Amino acid sequence: IVFVTLGADMNGKPDDARLDYEIVAWSESGASYSINHGSIGTFIPREGANGIDRERWTYHHGMERSVWTELDKIINEPIPTDSGHLMQIMTSGIDCGYLRDYAYQYIDSKDFTIVGLKGKDTDKFTMNMKDAKSFKQSLEKPNLYMVETNLTKERLASKMRLKWNDKLNVPQPSGFMNFPTPSGGKYLFNNYFSHYEAEHRILDKTNTFKWEKKNDMVQNHLFDCRLYAGVVGEIMVARVLKELKITNGTWKNYCDIVLDR
């Protein structure tokens, strides 16, 4: 594993917040491993005869049950590996397209270890350009990046279609996505994998495309979280290669640097 990232998606309202997230590990081969997913806050009322309302979280800073305090705990929690050593989340990305001022206050305090992400041209049809970057730095803030949403979702969908047979003793293809065995109520279809089926690609007559939800009832938040976890890793790699003055750098270049080869 080369590094671990986190992607987060803001939902709800300032005083009734839910922040969804996914933690993903990225291997030298290009395969990824989902480590955990979850939500800070919920829109589901507590069950029971008394109908007690759920505990509500807030996007306000410095208040009780602020999502930002809880997110700090999640990001700073060490992650055990199979070899016995601990890893930390290297970088995180938060969707700032909604309730941006709350998110900006948070990312501005993190010195680029956590950056903001915004979808770009989400409603426009896009050409599938293989060499196009998935992001560009925003003119608004140095720690905010504009994500080529349709292009990035297209690439994520391609990775979702990859197949691998573990009985053939061959490496996993680059981009292959690994998921834990469902346990503890996580990684089930209803609360996780259904999010990956919530959107579809729409083609127009010129063979350009865009991605959008199949209908207003479906939930796509964890699909977005996985997308953000991938993009923020690409951003970090690009920043490191730029600082080292490596032009047209690749994932292999980055791995060689961090693995001291």
Predicted segments with their positions:
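Conserved beta-strand -> loop -> alpha-helix junction used to position metal-binding or nucleic-acid-contacting
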Residues: 108-158
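RNase H-like, metal-dependent nuclease domains and their acidic two-metal-ion catalytic environment used
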Residues: 1-115, 153-261
